[in-house]
Amino acid sequence: MTLWSAEHAALATGGQAVGDWAVTGVSIDTRTLQTGDLFVALKAARDGHDFVANALAAGAGAALVSRVPDGVDDTAPLLIVPDVQAALEDLGR
């Protein structure tokens, strides 16, 4: 079941969706990512942007990012926002 489409996620966050995608879950960790999840590139002790390419290769439906990460094609399924944490909160509303 679709949790968010690219269009809905972009409207909810004010972000820019790249591509036409839909996601079925959410993950902040590539080790527990399920196929179809939205990978959220949070910045904490490590920068989640460093793991976006791996997440997409592992089957993430899209990634929530503040920039196109190194090693990720600019046509990859992304939701680009100014603030990843704030956008995640917006999606939760």
What positions do the PLM features span?
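N-terminal leader/targeting and accessory segments in enzymes
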Residues: 1-90
